[in-house]
């Protein structure tokens, strides 16, 4: 971790319109679709802004009514959009069908030729963006979208490092997006080597780096050690674990590694589940908030992140619309199941 410094959090990534059938209807049954907006990094920004953290999201939006509606959506949470690239292209869409019982959730993307995919290196004044920043967060979705978006992401990470920001990455592997030529392993290995904080799950670690996270907390501990050997710049590694009992009943927990400590969190039973989209982003936001707020108390930061993301499963939409007080109440109620430093 970099020395503590005041400043905003900057996030970078595509924002899309989400369209969902009401309730748990299938897309083929729907005669209307519920509309909201979301994107991994923007979801992080919106949660942090609600918790009083100064935050700016950098993205590209089409200069039309859909792009402006997307911007209004983010601004309502207090997210700064001072360096949005407005231009042509389109707003990406995704269709989310909520599952039930043994029918899993499904996602259908319609994001080709979006304004974000058309971003070109040199199009964002990163020195200006980072002038009053302390933290930069990105995810593996951004370089997956297109070759030019990947190069823009690389440019952003290097610019953040040059001015001493803490840089965090959520692997966020999306196999259907990596179709522009280079492999996710090749691109992400270079970018992750520049980061301070890495967030992932067993599936993304296997897909991107070919790593087997094994089972439970001890599996997380072992794979965290291997990641630390591969990427010596990493100072913190968080790994989430989701257990799926049915489409409506999951379990959720995480671990946190640092060079001289390993921390585990309680396991949360998520039942019933309203909406799982954005739960990983809620974890990331909770972790960033905790690391900025609780000093060296890594255990508390991890438990805050897991509690925040468990609450997200009860909130419709991509954004975790809960307060710090609500998160802390959930943490308190789970004191009988607390994690520990290993």
Model features per residue range: what roles?
Residues 159-166, 231-235:
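A short helix->loop->beta-strand "cap" motif at the edges of active sites that frequently abuts
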Residues 57, 167-169, 198:
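Hydrophobic faces of well-ordered beta-strands that scaffold small-molecule active sites
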Residues 164-171, 177:
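Short beta-strand/loop segments at the ligand-binding rim of alpha/beta enzyme cores
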Residues 11-25, 249-266:
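Acidic-glycine-rich active-site phosphate/pyrophosphate-binding loop
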Residues 177-260:
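Conserved phosphate/ATP/ADP-binding segment of small-molecule kinases
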Residues 263-333, 338, 342:
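Conserved post-catalytic alpha-helical subdomain immediately downstream of the catalytic base
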Residues 54-143, 327-334, 342:
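Conserved N-terminal subdomain of the carbohydrate kinase-like
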Residues 1-80, 100-102, 106, 119-122, ...:
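Glycine-rich phosphate/adenosyl-contacting loop at the front of the ribokinase-like
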């Amino acid at each position: 971790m970099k020395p503590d410094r005041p400043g905003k959090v900057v996030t970078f990534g595509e924002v899309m319109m989400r369209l969902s059938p009401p309730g748990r209807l299938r897309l083929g049954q729907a005669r209307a679709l519920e509309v909201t907006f979301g994107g991994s990094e923007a979801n992080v920004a919106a949660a942090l802004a609600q918790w009083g953290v100064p935050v700016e999201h950098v993205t590209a939006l089409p200069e039309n009514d859909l792009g402006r509606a997307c911007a209004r959506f983010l601004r309502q949470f207090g997210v700064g959009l001072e360096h949005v690239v407005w231009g042509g292209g389109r707003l990406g869409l995704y269709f989310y069908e909520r599952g039930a019982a043994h029918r899993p959730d499904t996602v259908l993307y319609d994001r080709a030729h979006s304004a974000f995919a058309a971003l070109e290196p040199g199009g964002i004044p990163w020195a200006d963006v980072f002038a009053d920043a302390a933290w930069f967060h990105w995810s593996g979705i951004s370089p997956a979208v297109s070759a030019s978006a990947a190069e823009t992401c690389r440019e952003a990470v290097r610019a953040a490092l040059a001015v001493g920001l803490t840089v965090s990455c959520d692997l966020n592997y999306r196999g259907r997006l990596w179709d522009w030529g280079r492999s996710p392993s090749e691109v992400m290995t270079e970018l992750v080597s520049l980061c301070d904080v890495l967030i992932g799950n067993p599936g993304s670690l296997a897909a991107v780096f070919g790593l087997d996270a094994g089972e439970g907390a001890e599996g997380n501990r072992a794979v965290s050690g291997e990641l630390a050997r591969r990427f010596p710049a990493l100072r913190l590694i968080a790994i989430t674990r989701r257990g799926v009992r049915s489409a409506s009943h999951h379990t959720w927990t995480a671990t946190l590694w640092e060079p001289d400590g390993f921390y585990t969190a309680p396991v949360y039973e998520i039942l019933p589940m309203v909406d799982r989209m954005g739960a990983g982003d809620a974890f990331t936001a909770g972790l960033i908030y905790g690391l900025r707020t609780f000093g060296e108390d890594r255990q508390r930061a991890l438990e805050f992140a897991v509690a925040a993301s468990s609450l997200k499963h009860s909130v419709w939409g991509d954004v975790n619309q809960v307060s710090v007080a609500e998160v802390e109440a959930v943490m308190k109620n789970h004191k009988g199941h607390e994690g520990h430093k290993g």
